[in-house]
Amino acid sequence: MQTAYWVMVMVMVWITAPLSEGGKPNDVIRGLVPDDLTPQLILRSLISRRRSDKDVGKRMECYWKSCSRPLSRRHDLG
């Protein structure tokens, strides 16, 4: 438990140290995100993941001899 506490403290120091040197919060946050991570890349990843979900098809889920209907997504939520 003490290790988790010290890891949390060190992460907080790592994040807030640039702020004490005059850095802006936005610059500090941008420094934590990889350079190749863009909103377009995130959106493309989500779209491709959604397409692969549709290809799987519906299947029955059975646990301990009780089967449930396949879960269907609500398409009206957009």
UniProtKB/Swiss-Prot annotation:
Protein name listed in UniProt: Consomatin Nc1
Keywords: Cleavage on pair of basic residues, D-amino acid, Disulfide bond, G-protein coupled receptor impairing toxin, Gamma-carboxyglutamic acid, Hydroxylation, Secreted, Signal, Toxin
Subcellular location(s) of the protein: Secreted
Tissues in which the UniProt entry reports expression: Expressed by the venom duct.
Post-translational modification D-tryptophan, affected residues: 64
Function: Moderately activates human somatostatin receptors (SSTR) with a preferential activation of SSTR1 and SSTR4. In vivo, does not cause behavioral changes in mice within a few minutes of intracranial injection, but causes a progressive loss of movement thereafter. Four to five hours after injection, mice recover, even with the highest dose tested. Shows antinociception and antihyperalgesia activities in two mouse models of acute pain, most probably by acting outside the central nervous system.
Propeptide: 23-59, 71-78
UniProt main location, coarse: secreted
Sites of 4-carboxyglutamate modification: 61
Residues of the signal peptide: 1-22
Family per similarity comment: Belongs to the conotoxin C superfamily. Consomatin family.
Keyword hit for Disulfide bond: yes
Disulphide connectivity of cysteines: 62-67
Source organism superkingdom: Eukaryota
GO (cellular component) term, any one: extracellular region
Annotated positions of the 4-hydroxyproline modification: 70
Gene Ontology molecular function terms on file: toxin activity
Taxonomy of the source species: Eukaryota, Metazoa, Spiralia, Lophotrochozoa, Mollusca
Note: This peptide is an evolutionarily optimized stable analog of somatostatin. In addition, it adopts nearly identical conformations as in the somatostatin drug analog Octreotide. As this drug, it contains a D-Trp at the same position, whose synthesis is a common strategy used for enhancing the metabolic stability of compounds in drug design.
Domain notes from UniProt: The cysteine framework is C-C.
